[in-house]
Amino acid sequence: MIKSELIARLANENPHLTQKDVERVVGVILERMIGALEDGGRVELRGFGALSVRSRPARTGRNPRTGEAVDVRAKHVPFFKSGKELRARLNADGDE
């Protein structure tokens, strides 16, 4: 599912809200989550999972085409850890 599909579904399931309103709400939620991660925080959605930022150190990589050594800079990457409830639902054997 992509962002536009999520917005369309939420708008269809909540007829009292316009698609524009849903779009705005989803946009604000995502911006707040990104802002928290930018500030070095963690975003936790109980039952779903937690987003955080991890640091990757600088390293020497290889160009797969030429085999030449390439310096890769240190960087920050988003990290997602799924929650227990999400893992349980994904691994349920159809008994729910």
UniProtKB/Swiss-Prot annotation:
InterPro entries: Hist_DNA-bd (IPR000119), Histone-like_DNA-bd_CS (IPR020816), IHF-like_DNA-bd_dom_sf (IPR010992), IHF_beta (IPR005685). The gene is ihfB. Heterodimer of an alpha and a beta chain. Belongs to the bacterial histone-like protein family. It holds the Pfam family Bac_DNA_binding. It comes from the Bacteria. One of its GO terms (biological process) is regulation of translation. This protein is one of the two subunits of integration host factor, a specific DNA-binding protein that functions in genetic recombination as well as in transcriptional and translational control. This is Integration host factor subunit beta. Keywords: DNA recombination, DNA-binding, Transcription, Transcription regulation, Translation regulation. One of its GO terms (cellular component) is chromosome. SUPFAM superfamilies: IHF-like DNA-binding proteins (SSF47729). It comes from Caulobacter vibrioides (strain NA1000 / CB15N) (Caulobacter crescentus). GO terms for molecular function: DNA binding; structural constituent of chromatin.
